[in-house]
Amino acid sequence: MRRTTPFRRKLRPMRVIDLRSDTVTKPTPAMRKAMAEAEVGDDVYSEDPTVNRLEALAAEILGLEAGLFVPSGVMSNQIALMLHLRRGYEVIAPEGAHIYEYEPGSLAVLSGGTIRLVRAPYGIPDPAEVKAAIHTSIHQAPTGLIELENTHNAAGGTVVPLEAQRAVQQVAREASLPIHLDGARLFNAAVALGSSAAELARGFDTVSICLSKGLGAPVGSVLLMPKALRAEAWRYRKLLGGGMRQAGVLAAAGILALTEGPKLLARDHQMARTLAEGLARLGLEVDLKTVQTNMVYFRPKDASGLAARLAQVGVLCNALGGRIRLVTHRDLSDEDIPEALRRIESVLVET
């Protein structure tokens, strides 16, 4: 007699919870519609009306005179450094700065410059140490620029308070040095501080903001600057291969990222806090003082090994310098953080 096959419940595929970065966000339906309907022209000729609107909007929101839409945050930062530095000059930056850790030698290649790092607990440099790091001797690389990063990625997504920024800006003014802000996640800082992005951008010569992280656009950053620097920045963008022709299809998403994206960041921050507290309850080494925006770092015994095991249970994260980084973002559901904690706990129990 033929055996009947027992009923088998069809298992749903495991949902992947992607905590590697807020760059993994996908454009919303509204963004896709705006992109499809965007009015375009040739942006290399400054004839794309949607790009022009994005640049003007970013400048208005940040309180600077002019903006330049570029493909990436690295390009935005590097154009700023090219604007400010002469070859052989030095940038003073906080330890762990993105321009030092994650922009692979671009400063040396493009500007012929070097970086001097100063101590920056929680991403906040001591203005006295910044002042002491300024070089004027012919025996040393002369200082050409001071740079800050807000929020500070490597410090844990920490926020540089307004008064700390003002103190370093004062050092720059007294030394007649320009000052650049890497504000890739500046809107996260503004939400965390209950401030405006314009207030945090005030006093900087140039500011870089990223549209494709927590704000949710698929591509792009904007470099904000005085009008007097805009033509030279435009030339540098062309030199670096950043002219994108009918870029209005991308700028349309960027406009929505700027107008709608900041409203969702507080939720990202709350998810990160919930995640961090849950990890601490699991006995993991989490410095809760650093969990100020949408990032959580912790230091396990084997970061790379743990990241690989978590990937097997559908939790994606990055191992960076012996630490695990988890980043919350708009594409996560309300159930994803509790579920991620359950999966992390199951992996820890097995090891």
Regions found by a protein language model. Give the residues of each.
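N-terminal amphipathic/basic-hydrophobic helices that include classical n-h-c signal peptides
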Residues: 1-13
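Conserved PLP-enzyme active-site core in the AAT-like
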Residues: 11-300, 304-313, 317-332, 340-350
